[in-house]
Amino acid sequence: MAAKDVRFGNDARVKMLEGVNILADAVKVTLGPKGRNVVLDKSFGAPTITKDGVSVAREIELEDKFQNMGAQMVKEVASQANDAAGDGTTTATVLAQAIVNEGLKAVAAGMNPMDLKRGIDKAVIAAVEELKALSVPCADTKAIAQVGTISANSDSSVGNIIAEAMEKVGRDGVITVEEGQALQDELDVVEGMQFDRGYLSPYFINNQESGSVELDNPFILLVDKKISNIRELLPVLEGVAKASRPLLIVAEDVEGEALATLVVNNMRGIVKVAAVKAPGFGDRRKAMLQDIAILTGGVVISEEIGLELEKATLEDLGQAKRVSITKENSTIIDGAGDQAAIQGRVAQIRQQIEEATSDYDKEKLQERVAKLAGGVAVIKVGAATEVEMKEKKDRVEDALHATRAAVEEGVVAGGGVALIRAASKLSSLVGDNEEQNVGIRVALRAMEAPLRQIVKNAGDEESVVANNVRAGEGNYGYNAATGVYGDMIEMGILDPTKVTRSALQFAASVAGLMITTEAMITELPKKDAPAMPDMGMGGMGGMM
């Protein structure tokens, strides 16, 4: 076992604080509308330029192991804020740094660290309640666009495209961000339910221009098994032919004689038909077939529940206004399912999302909700160079998370104003003893730090602005982008309540642990073993 280096008390805390400050100083320059860029060196390729706090934090690893422990703990604050709300990482880092610096000064002055921590916790719990009271719902497209704009470092084009995407696919729709091919941002919206399975035979294609299968007002047959025998399909095919409507077959697979017969019938024009494989695998496939059944008002023909394909009738088939199938994807538009049944299914999947433990499962379940509830939007980020593209994609993803958080818990005045208003309401808060009161004051003073940093990054005088904002009321604050005082919500400077709340809670949690640290242990570097002595081959010259 390797030897350890152990440090105690003030000696340990000083080193830890140095690490905290190195990481926080690198991250906090990105805060606000006039936040600066940070350039990250990469082991290969061009350096990355970013204004995303968590991206900067993730890159930092310090040589001194005691300093590094402090830096890693603040990195944890940024990561937790990012996981919970998807944004607010820089605010969380700035708050953590302020609480740790003020808290450790009090510890050095002889205060009891445990009482300090209790005071900080008490102040944060009260501040969170005040933030909830200050929160206003974020319902309209304009407010959503404003939140997105602020989170994307005051880039209004990003805010507008996110608001447009949310308007088109609804609050539950899936919005993904991809790298585009053009210079401008683009928005692609897929309406209806799309799944990643294409036609089983190119002979089903009826739109030669686009190379796709287009079926208008089709019946949809859903089967939870492989179909290889055409006899099983005959009753359904005859019924569909009499109705003179097209048929889409979604099954585990259609092969051999069955596929060949369908192709021949389609080419001769006897019955317009197309077949695709069911999406997903295993239990997920069964669940997605059931989703399609509910969306289209059909039934999944499955032997598990006693239904046989030979006995299927037109009543068992789903229906839709249109189906479009390409080589890779199938899209069902305007299914004929009962709206109450669809809403019930969505509620059921939401419950599964609440109970899911893995991120992968949650993501897949969220996709299913979106496909049932509205659709999928893809924001394609455009830029002139790859470096700019990566930087912008980071900002768009941040803005997307921020708008989702805003819709969930509402918004408060941005620019650090909400924290100052919450702190001013708690001026009469007292703890159980004087040391807890110091802890409360540490937390309340730290809540000014985000505003001060935003002003500093904009090149203005932080103390003057902080005093002016503190003297104001309600949403009165400072717009660092224009240098104007006014109502922050009217100026469109909004922060999601969830982002501000999460930043404060996680910052206080980790800062409290650091203030109460009394010893730090790290591994000593291993000393290299001495080299083998030179054996020397002297006196052996003359050997042939």
Curated annotation (Swiss-Prot):
Binding site for ATP: 30-33, 51, 87-91, 415, 479-481, 495
Record-linked PROSITE patterns: CHAPERONINS_CPN60
One GO biological process term: chaperone cofactor-dependent protein refolding
Subcellular location: Cytoplasm
Top EC group: isomerase
Isomerase among keywords: yes
Any Gene Ontology CC annotation: GroEL-GroES complex
Top-level lineage group: Bacteria
UniProt cross-references to InterPro entries, sorted A to Z: Chaperonin_Cpn60_CS, Cpn60/GroEL, Cpn60/GroEL/TCP-1, GroEL-like_apical_dom_sf, GROEL-like_equatorial_sf, TCP-1-like_intermed_sf
Keywords: ATP-binding, Chaperone, Cytoplasm, Isomerase, Nucleotide-binding
Catalysed reactions, semicolon-separated: ATP + H2O + a folded polypeptide = ADP + phosphate + an unfolded polypeptide
Location (main, coarse): cytoplasm
SUPFAM superfamilies: GroEL apical domain-like, GroEL equatorial domain-like, GroEL-intermediate domain like
Enzyme Commission number(s) of this protein: 5.6.1.7
MF term (GO), any: ATP binding
HAMAP family: CH60 (MF_00600)
Family: Belongs to the chaperonin (HSP60) family.
Protein's job: Together with its co-chaperonin GroES, plays an essential role in assisting protein folding. The GroEL-GroES system forms a nano-cage that allows encapsulation of the non-native substrate proteins and provides a physical environment optimized to promote and accelerate protein folding.
Complexes and interactors: Forms a cylinder of 14 subunits composed of two heptameric rings stacked back-to-back. Interacts with the co-chaperonin GroES.
Protein name, per record: Chaperonin GroEL 1
Organism: Vibrio cholerae serotype O1 (strain ATCC 39315 / El Tor Inaba N16961)
